[in-house]
Regions:
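Bacterial N-terminal signal peptides that target proteins for export
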Residues: 1-12
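Bacterial N-terminal signal peptides
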Residues: 10-20
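Sec/Tat signal peptide C-region and signal peptidase I cleavage site
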Residues: 22-28
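Zymogen propeptides
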Residues: 29-94
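Hydrophobic, often amphipathic alpha-helical segments used for membrane interaction and targeting
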Residues: 42, 168, 216-360, 375-376, ...
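Acidic/histidine-rich, surface-exposed loop or edge segments in extracytoplasmic proteins
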Residues: 60-71, 101-109, 324-331
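A short acidic, amphipathic alpha-helical/loop segment
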Residues: 76-84, 104, 347, 376
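Low-complexity, acidic interaction segments enriched in glycine
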Residues: 106-107, 111-223
């Protein structure tokens, strides 16, 4: 009997569908695949990701390496990717980012610089809130925020500590109190300030100070840290690693070549489909995410269920890339896949336009983005195929699933049939 695999199958289909919608939306492939699953006679199943190297047709310009990313994989995959990407001159990588993270172009007008500065102040407040949740205190300033945060967060803070006019952002605090149940309770809030276009305090118009303040915090205020996202919980359940936990993306030659969260949410909202729920689920904020997280904790406790789910997911990833099963999500696809691909190409064109001796540019993005990127780079930028290199991302022995060879074959057929019926 294979009925005991069905709950895992159903859960995996739900989770993988939502994860794919977030970053690796399936699309019709116009090129050879960027993922593949193979199995040895001994029952070892492996998922491999492709690095496709393109070279200029005319022989001039850098090579472009399209390197398939996957957000959860075995730790060894991320170690291999880290070593390989460090060899390249520039890396353009995937990751929907908070507003305010991009560099501010010094050629912008003052109004645009002011808007970009506000985004930075908002981001600093968000980071300070998470700092308080972890440390039960507010940071004493930007230096404290950097010194006592994990390297990835510290690098973000270091990149946004100046305003749009390249002046240091000022940190200040106000001590106050609120009345609660007839008692005064001491509170404090943090404020981040830019001195504006004139680089001096006060002023009017674009010269006016730009200040944003937090809500008041009390000394004993224990706020909850942000919930784990579905992808982190899925990684834990499958006993694999999460990309952001394993890879150091802070190299100055690495560029986050993706939309920011405000841009993505705005474009999704413009469709009128209420697609903010996708981001809430991936980030762990929705009720559905909490239910799935609860189920994943049970999977994580069972090595057999964990291995079974890992096998199912590997098959699904390869199957989704080679199919059009999610084609009815056409409007969402236009933003999550095609819109973000356009963003990558914009970043790539900026790098190609620079007068440098760059020899190799890597694009580290989800596999489903790659066929479209490859087509654009070949047709519009004058490139051609050079070579493929494959790297193992995940592996599982069928013996670890607790199923017989016949049951595993039946389960794989169930996956294919379930996807075809659902989509």
């Amino acid at each position: 009997m294979i009925h005991r695999a069905c709950p895992v199958l159903q859960l995996t289909i739900a989770l993988l569908t939502l994860s794919v919608l977030h970053s690796n939306h399936a699309a019709a492939s116009v090129s050879d695949p960027y993922t593949r699953v193979s199995e040895t006679e001994s029952g070892l199943v492996t998922l491999e990701m492709c690095e496709r190297t393109l070279k200029p047709s005319a022989g001039e310009g850098p090579r472009i390496h399209l390197i398939s990313a996957i957000h959860i994989a075995d730790k060894q995959f991320y170690e291999a990717m880290q070593d390989r990407l460090e060899l390249y001159d520039t890396v353009l990588f995937e990751g929907v980012k908070p507003a305010g993270l991009d560099a501010i172009d010094p050629e912008l007008d003052d109004e645009s610089k002011a808007e970009a500065t506000r985004d930075r102040l908002e981001l600093l407040l968000d980071i300070s809130d998470q700092f308080h949740a972890l440390n039960a205190r507010l940071p004493e300033g930007i230096d404290d925020l950097m010194e006592n945060s994990e390297p990835r967060i510290a690098a973000i803070v270091g990149s946004i500590r100046s305003d749009g006019w390249d002046q240091p952002i000022i940190t200040s605090f106000v001590d106050t109190s609120i009345s609660k149940n007839g008692e005064d309770k001491a509170t404090q809030y943090i404020t981040f300030t830019s001195t504006g276009a004139d680089r001096q305090r006060d002023g009017t118009g674009v010269d006016a100070d730009i200040s944003l303040s937090s809500e008041p915090y009390s000394p004993n205020d224990r706020r909850k840290a942000a919930p784990e996202g579905i992808q982190t919980q899925l990684a834990n359940a499958l006993r694999v690693s999460f990309q952001l936990d394993e890879m150091d993306m802070t190299n100055p030659k690495w560029i986050n070549a993706d939309m920011d969260i405000n841009e993505l949410q705005e474009q999704l909202a413009n469709m009128g489909e209420g697609d903010g729920m996708i981001l809430d689920l991936i980030e762990g904020n929705s009720f559905q995410a909490k239910l799935m997280g609860f189920a994943l904790k049970f999977v994580a406790r069972s090595p057999t269920m964990s291995s079974m789910m890992k096998l199912v997911m590997m098959d699904m990833l390869a199957l989704m890339e080679s199919s059009e099963m999610l084609s009815q999500f056409e409007e969402i696809e236009s933003v999550i896949l095609h819109g973000r691909n356009n963003t990558v190409i914009d970043y790539l064109n900026k790098e190609l336009a620079k007068d440098t001796q760059v020899e190799d540019i890597a694009i580290f993005y989800g596999a489903a983005h790659m066929p479209g990127l490859e087509e654009t780079i070949i047709k519009d930028l004058g490139y051609e195929f050079e070579s493929d290199t494959w790297t193992q991302a995940m592996a599982v022995s069928t013996e670890e699933t607790g199923l017989s060879a016949g049951q595993i074959k039946m389960m794989r057929n169930m996956i294919k049939n379930a996807l075809e019926q659902q989509f």
